[in-house]
C-alpha cells in the first residue's frame, strides 16, 4: 500500500533448506523445484532442455545447493499421492497444494501465508473494513479470502469449489472480466 509491503509471510533461508531436504528425501535428489523470491523465480530444470513454457523464460537456473534467499513460495514435482502424504507429514507447518491443471506440481507455502491472513493488515493500512473489500479468485488458495471479503468474485475458469463459494462468478481470468466487473461497480 502506497509503495510499502503490508503483509509478507515466507521461508527464511534455513527453512528453505529444510524444505529442500524433505523434498529430496521423499521425492528424490533430482526432483524439479522452483522457488519464488523477491529477487526472482529460480528453477532447477534440466539445462539441456528449454523450460517448456515461454512464460518461464526469465527463470534463473539454480541447483539450490547454496541457496540462501528468503522464499515466498516453493514448488516441487511430487509424482505420487504417497509422496504428497509423506511430504505433508514431514512439513506440518506448511500448506501443500496441487496446482489445478498441473497434477504433479505442488505449491508449498507456510501455513500462515494465506490471502485471507493478508486481508486484515491490508484493511488496516487502507482504513477499510473487510466488508468493503472485493476479492477475486480462481483456485483453492482463494477460498477463505473470498468467504471473508465483503464481495467474493470467482473467475469463470476457476475451480468449481471457488465458484460455489463466491458471491458472483464473472468471465475467465484471461479476458478483461475483472476490468469489466469493476467498471460496473464504478457507477
Predicted regions and their residues:
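Short, surface-exposed amphipathic charged segments that create phosphate/polyanion-binding patches used
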Residues: 4-7, 49-51, 114-115, 184-187
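Glycine/small-residue-rich loop that forms an oxyanion/phosphate-binding "nest" at active or ligand-binding sites
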Residues: 1-17, 23
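Conserved active-site and cofactor/substrate-binding residues in soluble primary-metabolism enzymes
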Residues: 14, 114, 173
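Asp-based, Mg2+/Mn2+-dependent phosphohydrolase catalytic module
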Residues: 148, 153-187
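A short acidic, helix-capping loop that chelates divalent metal ions and anchors anionic groups
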Residues: 1-2, 105-107, 162
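Conserved acidic, metal-coordinating active-site core of Asp-based
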Residues: 18, 22-136, 140-145, 157
Amino acid at each position: 500500500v502506497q509503495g510499502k509491503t503490508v503483509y509478507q509471510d515466507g521461508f527464511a533461508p534455513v527453512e528453505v533448506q529444510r524444505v529442500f531436504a524433505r523434498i529430496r528425501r521423499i521425492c528424490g535428489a533430482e526432483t524439479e523445484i522452483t522457488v519464488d523470491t523477491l529477487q526472482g523465480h529460480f528453477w532447477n530444470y534440466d539445462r539441456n532442455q528449454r523450460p517448456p513454457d515461454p512464460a518461464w523464460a526469465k527463470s534463473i537456473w539454480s541447483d539450490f545447493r547454496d541457496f540462501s534467499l528468503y522464499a515466498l513460495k516453493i514448488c516441487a514435482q511430487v509424482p505420487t499421492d504417497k509422496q504428497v502424504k509423506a511430504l505433508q507429514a514431514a512439513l506440518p507447518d506448511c500448506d501443500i497444494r496441487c496446482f489445478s491443471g498441473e497434477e504433479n506440481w505442488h505449491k508449498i507455502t507456510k501455513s500462515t501465508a494465506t490471502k485471507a491472513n493478508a486481508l486484515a493488515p491490508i484493511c488496516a493500512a487502507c482504513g477499510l473494513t473487510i466488508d468493503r473489500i472485493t476479492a477475486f479468485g480462481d483456485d483453492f488458495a482463494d477460498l477463505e479470502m473470498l468467504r471473508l471479503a465483503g464481495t467474493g468474485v470467482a473467475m469463470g475458469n476457476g475451480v468449481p469449489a471457488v465458484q460455489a463459494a463466491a458471491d458472483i462468478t464473472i468471465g475467465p481470468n484471461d479476458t478483461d472480466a475483472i476490468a469489466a466487473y469493476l467498471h460496473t461497480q464504478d457507477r
